[in-house]
Amino acid sequence: MTDPKSPLILVVDDYQDAREMYAEYLQFSGFRVAEAKNGNEAVEQALALKPALILMDLSLPGMDGWEATRRLKADESTRHIPIVALTGHALAGASEGAKKAGCDSFVTKPCLPDDLVVEVRRMLNTAKPA
């Protein structure tokens, strides 16, 4: 069982299997997890829950992860939340584009569970408090 005081991670991915897989990795590592399947849900969940970190797929239906990230970083109540782009965009420049949109880090999927957890922990350790 996850400690209710452990950091809450919002996992945003339109692909249910990916969301569930990332959630399991994180829960197994001691994190609490909330999920969203598109950019609109990501913004709503982030505003309501104030997670410690957001894993954001950039290719989402409706409002994509790029726009959701821009909106969250523009909002005073969520701009401090680290956002890790979790995406299949492995093209040159995708990482830089994600950072320009406001992402704090970039992980290419598929990624190994340990690599994802290491990056989440690294970002939480370097995050500025609200």
Residue ranges of model-derived segments:
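Short acidic/polar segment at the start of the alpha1 helix of CheY-like receiver
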Residues: 15-19
